[in-house]
Amino acid sequence: MRLFDFGRAPNPRRVRIFLAEKQVEIPRVTVNLFRREQLSPEFLAINPGGTVPVLELDDGTYLSECLAICQYLDAMHPEPALFGTTPRQQALTLMWANIVDNEGMSAIAEVLRNLSPGFRD
């Protein structure tokens, strides 16, 4: 596995925090957003959305989106169970994570995107 990452971006940071809590190390590939590497044909072939993080699985499958990546990692490395161990715990974790994404992180991401020279036309 490899994690396509950018150290200063908030979403990849969430995955790195998750990995640290799990005590799992995965090789990282830096995608420099300031240099617009996320818009290169090579990266768009990996993730047509042009966003990080992206987790490349050993079979060549690519996962994007923090929650999908973290849920996969939680299933592959079940201890500690950060998404919970029961269906109720897992559903509550996903519910609150989605609320944070939809009501908090999206607004912050738009501000950062509009302030960043790497995203200007």
Question: Locations of the language-model features?
Answer:
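GST-like domain detector, emphasizing the conserved glutathione-binding G-site
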Residues: 1-121
